[in-house]
From Swiss-Prot:
PROSITE patterns: MFS. InterPro entries: MFS (IPR011701), MFS_dom (IPR020846), MFS_MdtG_subfamily (IPR050497), MFS_trans_sf (IPR036259). Disulfide bonds: none annotated. It is a multi-pass membrane protein. This is Uncharacterized MFS-type transporter y4xM. Belongs to the major facilitator superfamily. It comes from the Bacteria. The chain crosses the membrane at residues 11-31, 49-69, 89-109, 151-171, 178-198, 211-231, 253-273, 284-304, 311-331, 346-366, 377-397. GO terms for cellular component: plasma membrane. The keyword Ubl conjugation does not apply. It is found in: Cell inner membrane. It comes from Sinorhizobium fredii (strain NBRC 101917 / NGR234).
Amino acid sequence: MTRTVAVLRGFGPVFALLFGLQFISMGAMEMNGPFWPIQIKALSPSDSVFGLAGIGVYVCPMLGVSLTSAFWGRMGDRYGNRLMMVRALLGLAITQLLVAFAQDVWTILALRFLQGACAGYIAPAQAYGVEVTGGRDRARLFAWLQVATNVGSLGGAFLGGLILDALPFAAVNLTAGVICAFCAAVAWTSLPVPLGGAGLTKTAKATTVSCAPSTGVSVFGLLALMGLLLASRMVLQVPFSLYMSEVYGSQHWITGLSYGLLALGFVVAAPVWARTFEGREPSFVLGCNVLIAGGCFVATGLAGSTRAIGLFAALYFTWGALLGGTTPVLLSLVSAATRSERQGSVLGLAQTCQQGASVVGIIAGVAATQRFGLKAAFPLVTGLYGLSFLVALGLWLKARQSRR
């Protein structure tokens, strides 16, 4: 806790507020995350509708985000990332409140798509963070913003499970909508408007768009690796609650807590990874990501084979800790390779790639479990991490050759 306070003070009071907004709003959005299959199954008139809607309830908002993130990023560069943050929070609040009153799966899917199209909060928050911190220490900046997201996910999933054990599913969405509306009001009244990016350092402004001349690794290569790592993680998004019920017979709050352990592992490890990678060459970061992908391969393979819930929880936590060294650090390399006036656009593109990869992972997970049963979920995750290992290895070897 002391270290967290010190980091927030080091970045300044505006970042502390930004951290708090990210923590609260993303936690609110994750309150219903692990429980959508239960609600969709209750509302579906047939198994075929459930199979389609069970995918769509996660894919639709991601499609919305992937289709609009680049556009909202350009709008952020033009009109300000602070305004885009407020817009996203209002969109989340309104659609969450509407979803609470939806009583058929098709209305829910339409609203979830609209939710994604109107949202896209994370990319402008990252770009705004670069502005208010002067573009310094991006790895730690993105790591701590991701920590806020994952701490919120941990608390949100657990709180959502508690609410669902006592109240109808609509209560979860109503609570999330009110919280997002509150965050929008706080962002509008409390976050300062950066004066034309004046807070950015000259070094940040002089950064070039491509990192290839100095590292031999393109921005698109980094985005591809991030996408594959995300697809691997998202395979379990839909079947997780059903897997926990079938294999362990767990209650909703245990499912929510287990779901949040991935986020908790990330929270604990991400700042450590950020300090480890601070000032390091991209080739070092990629080399570590080769080892991280291999570690994820082992952890998920063991998690899928155990029937002891204690060991499963420990492995899920370990998996999250390994993931702390992936997306934030790779994203910081992308940001550092981008001119200051294009931060919104490029981070919006990164968000589009991440959401697209998440969609692929979700569809792959649902297709595999529908075809082969829930037992196929973890082997698929393990296989995708094997592929991630090979991609990271290729990028690392290319970076080493470039240095020579």
